[in-house]
């Protein structure tokens, strides 16, 4: 890089891309001048919150990476009844820090305007409580009765600016008790 070249800068929070011209290099720093702000970056028009059932082994790392690359706004690991993985407080904190690092790297790699947050794991009940306040909450469930027509209708109802919760279960799926709790809180089952 040299003076006169243009660089793209992001604060990782507001989704904007700041285009700057390099002015000079001083004592390990780069002085730039803001040229313009690109408001319509690569972020999705809605915020997608992934409530991910804890998977076996290190599969969560790949899930975090790919979901960040695809545009997910926040990832909430969820301890479900059928989850094989059981994390104590210390392990949960360590894993969350690792997952957050993966989210940051994936956001930079895919030139995201924000760095999605990976929260500490929560119980299924806590996840349902949080998701129930969102504009649209969906839970894929193999026994959903309304089929693909309702699934299409719900997905097509998503609008810019909405907060959308998507639940994904662990390898064994969700217990009927968990599905019932989701239904009681207006989380819609889809196929």
What are these regions (language model features)?
Residues 1-39:
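N-terminal positively charged helical leader segments and presequences
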Residues 2, 73, 188:
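Short acidic/polar active-site loop segments enriched in Thr and Asp
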Residues 6, 55, 171-175:
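Gly/Ser/Thr-rich beta-alpha loop segments that engage phosphate groups in nucleotides
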Residues 7, 33, 42-51, 155-162:
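Mobile, glycine- and charge-enriched loop segments
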Residues 32, 115-119, 189:
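Generic structural signal for residues in well-ordered beta-strands
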Residues 39-139:
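RNA substrate-binding interface of SAM-dependent RNA methyltransferases
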